[in-house]
Amino acid sequence: MRCEKLDVWKRSARLSVEVYKAFANCKDFGFKDQITRSSLSVPSNIAEGMEKDSKKEQSRFLEIAKGSSAELITQIYIAIEISYIEKQIGLSWKKEIEEILKMLVGLQQKINSESEH
């Protein structure tokens, strides 16, 4: 399945764009690098996984995307606490990434059930 057809890919790519824009002028290059890499990793791993022939490989890349989502939640919390982003924006991103995580779990379960048949 092409990743561009998946809502989870679309939403995670959109969130990554928002993160990149929000941190474009951030002078803390270490933090900026980490949070943008995490946000980019989610849609990138979804895309890479969906191009794999094996259901096991597809599931593995979705697992990596889930891990990157968890990293991003942590970095969002820290960004709020150190005033790199407004609380409202951070909480909106956190809510979105939690929805993305639910979608990843659902997609992974679907793929895993297909591989059992």
Question: What does each model-found stretch correspond to?
Answer:
Residues M1-H117:
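Amphipathic alpha-helical assembly/interaction segments
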